[in-house]
Amino acid sequence: VLLHPNFSDEEANGVAVSFDPFYQTEGHFYLNTQVGENLITNPDAQSIPEEILLDKVRGGPFTIVRPSNQVEDGEQVLTIAHMESLRTMLQKVTSRFRNLYGKSVRDEFAIDVEFKITSEGLLSIKQARPWIF
């Protein structure tokens, strides 16, 4: 059983994957984020989520593959601080799950994480699970 608090008035919610399953780039985390409580899995019909490829290296660059249509032009759903928090968290969670599952760094292995940005602007991990290749 997984229990977590209900987040009211969240700034954003999303899914982060510790590799890039969609554009097949090397050395990136894939981030898919919606504004507020609009779900990634079942969004409002006209809502487009923000897609980011985040370099795995701390402080490294990011690419907005697709901007959200729920923010002003030129604005982002995730701040630089949020992306840095996600980068750090993805590295830690992937490493710990890799060890738990007995996978070496040579094995194909990745983690899929659901996250929230709370109304206080803090990253909260809702759940993490291995990506199935």
Task: Please identify what each model-predicted range represents.
Residues 1-133:
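Nucleotide/phosphate-binding sheet-loop regions of phosphoryl- and nucleotidyl-transfer enzymes
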